[in-house]
């Protein structure tokens, strides 16, 4: 199947965003600590922890920093009771947004999220107001690679779809349950993905013009800057022509 890479387009200016490395590290360390506290420090038994550690390694976090965070999670922790919360809302053009947070103060977090939406022309909705527009799935992306080899291995292991994009990148789509198996088989076969995660994929996307895209990206940037934000999902489609002008 051919297409246009959603990852290479809409994971909005990640090269620029990743310049905020210190903030990214702080968020990832908190996620590692909490995941280890909730599910234990062994990645064989804690898939959530494995995903977060893979993200940390992908941004060049040192292994001893990761190990120390896991140890903190297995120990006394810091006394705070964090909970996972998902907020849902709409932005310009009817774009749907979901924000996954780790919060130790629900009232503060919802106030911060609501303020971000209102400031940038969006509206915070109720639980379930946009989540029905998304499906949970595994996503394994390769910048380039042997398409036939990737396709053969992935399909043999039960991948749902293989997408060859206009920029020659390749995306493997899996069920959440098959994600780790397929990713591990591809990796052990010498096929190292540029990005891999279990994500929420929208059923369809809303294309934004330059004006709406500028305002939309300001909302996304604001949400990403909040300490409590863990992950953002949305169904906006910003063309390459518009993206280069942001």
From Swiss-Prot:
Keywords: Cytoplasm, DNA-binding, Transcription, Transcription regulation. Gene3D superfamilies: 1.10.10.200, 3.30.70.980. Pfam families: TACO1_YebC_N, Transcrip_reg. It is found in: Cytoplasm. The keyword Transcription applies. It comes from the Bacteria. One of its GO terms (molecular function) is DNA binding. Its main location: cytoplasm. Disulfide bonds: none annotated. GO terms for biological process: regulation of DNA-templated transcription. One of its GO terms (cellular component) is cytosol. Belongs to the TACO1 family. HAMAP family: Transcrip_reg_TACO1. NCBIfam families: PRK00110.1 (NF001030), PRK12378.1 (NF009044), YebC/PmpR family DNA-binding transcriptional regulator (TIGR01033). This is Probable transcriptional regulatory protein Rmag_0394. It comes from Ruthia magnifica subsp. Calyptogena magnifica. The lineage of its organism: Bacteria, Pseudomonadati, Pseudomonadota, Gammaproteobacteria, Candidatus Pseudothioglobaceae.
């Amino acid at each position: 199947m051919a297409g246009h890479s959603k990852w290479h387009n809409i994971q909005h200016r990640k090269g620029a965003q990743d310049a905020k490395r210190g903030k990214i590290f702080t968020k990832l360390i908190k996620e590692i600590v909490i995941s280890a506290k909730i599910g234990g420090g062994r990645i064989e038994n804690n898939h959530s922890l494995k995903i977060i550690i893979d993200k940390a390694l992908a941004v060049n976090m040192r292994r001893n920093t990761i190990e120390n965070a896991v140890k903190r999670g297995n120990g006394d922790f810091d006394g705070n009771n964090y909970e996972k919360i998902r907020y849902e809302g709409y932005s310009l053009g009817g774009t749907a947004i979901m924000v996954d947070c780790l919060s130790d103060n629900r009232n503060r977090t919802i106030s911060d999220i609501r303020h971000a939406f209102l400031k940038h022309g969006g509206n915070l909705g109720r639980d379930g107001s946009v989540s029905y527009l998304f499906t949970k799935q595994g996503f394994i992306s390769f910048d380039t690679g042997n398409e036939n080899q990737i396709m053969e291995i992935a399909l043999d292991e039960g991948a749902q779809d293989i997408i060859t994009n206009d920029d020659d990148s390749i995306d493997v789509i899996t069920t959440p349950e098959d994600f780790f198996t397929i990713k591990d088989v591809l990796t052990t076969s010498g096929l190292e993905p540029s990005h891999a995660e279990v994500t929420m994929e929208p059923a369809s996307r809303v294309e934004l013009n330059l004006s709406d895209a500028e305002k939309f990206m300001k909302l996304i940037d604001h949400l990403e800057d909040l300490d409590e934000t863990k992950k953002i999902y949305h169904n906006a489609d910003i063309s390459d022509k518009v993206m280069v002008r942001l």
